[in-house]
Amino acid sequence: MKSKAEKSQFSKLVSDNGIWVVLVVLIIFITIINRNFLTPNNAVALLTGESVKGVMTFGVTLAILSKGIDLSTGSVAALSAICSAALCQASTTKLWAGLPTMPAIVGILGGIAIGVIVGFANGWMVAYLRLHPFIATLGTQLICRALCKLITPGPVSKLTPGFRFLGNGKIGPFHMIVIVMIIMFIILAFMLKMTRFGKSVYAVGGNDQAARVAGINVEHTLVKVYIWCSFCAALGGVLLAGRSDSADPANTGLNYELDAIAAATVGGTSQTGGICRPSGVIAGILIMGVINNGMVMMGVNDQMTFIVKGLIIIGSVAFDMRKNAVKK
């Protein structure tokens, strides 16, 4: 009986932390193929490389948790990056001629404000116009990317040192971009576990009608969800601009929404809504980072990497739906 109980506890432990087991197995597999994968320098490169996508994943997580989706995050990141970069150009040839070079904080807040406005629009369309989140955010995705190309046909570059610090700077041995991701994760975890808003998002995602009966303002909750989502996307865009010292209307944030959705889904945020573990989201981000980094180190081309990511998204959603069907 003791043996069976121990086996049951072990099975529960693996089941509850299966995503971390997958991460460890993946790391071991890639390390066997390329021993340079598990080195301190590559670990730092992986973390800094995935930090922006991580921040954006924290936003998408709430949208999925509310039984929605946000396809606009990559384009919102690009629009915010371009606007914030334009405010903080140190070059003599500016995108907006005659505009003085602004302090870094003005550029950062300006870029984030753009994201908040788009997030409000997304939330309003989903909550009050009753548009499906897929349609609403697909529309804003196209609009934001088009606005990027209307604002500037080419990259906005040569940014001020203060602005670049957010993406490239360090505080002691720690990269600023990683610190920002950790802070955003702490905010997400606190929000979901300790605040009324977080509990409302769980309730709306689980059953919006029951949430309404329980006195939750479903519309206000959804608007806040999409504002948070675009806030994270805009912050990600600002980080991208600071890290690369430029913002490109065609390439900045391109397809980042796919990685964010994949990471959130792989991390256990259910596409059916109402289910999310913040620790699982971190594991999902790391898994996607390991795949991205590992594929490069193994010499796999970009198209094959996209195929693998697509299969991961399909597999994760299929597994999630099957698991929920069994529970019902």
Region spans (language model):
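Inter-helical junctions in multi-pass inner-membrane proteins, predominant
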Residues: 35-49, 148-149, 158, 192-193, ...
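Single transmembrane alpha-helix segments in multi-pass membrane proteins
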Residues: 25-91, 124-131, 268-278, 311, ...
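Transmembrane alpha-helical segments in multi-pass inner-membrane proteins
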Residues: 233, 244, 248-310
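Alpha-helical transmembrane segments within multi-pass membrane transporters and channels
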Residues: 92-141, 283
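Membrane-interfacial amphipathic/re-entrant helices at transmembrane-helix boundaries
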Residues: 2-57, 92-106, 216, 224
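Helix-loop-helix "hairpin" substructures at the membrane interface of multi-pass membrane proteins
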Residues: 103-110, 117-122, 173-248
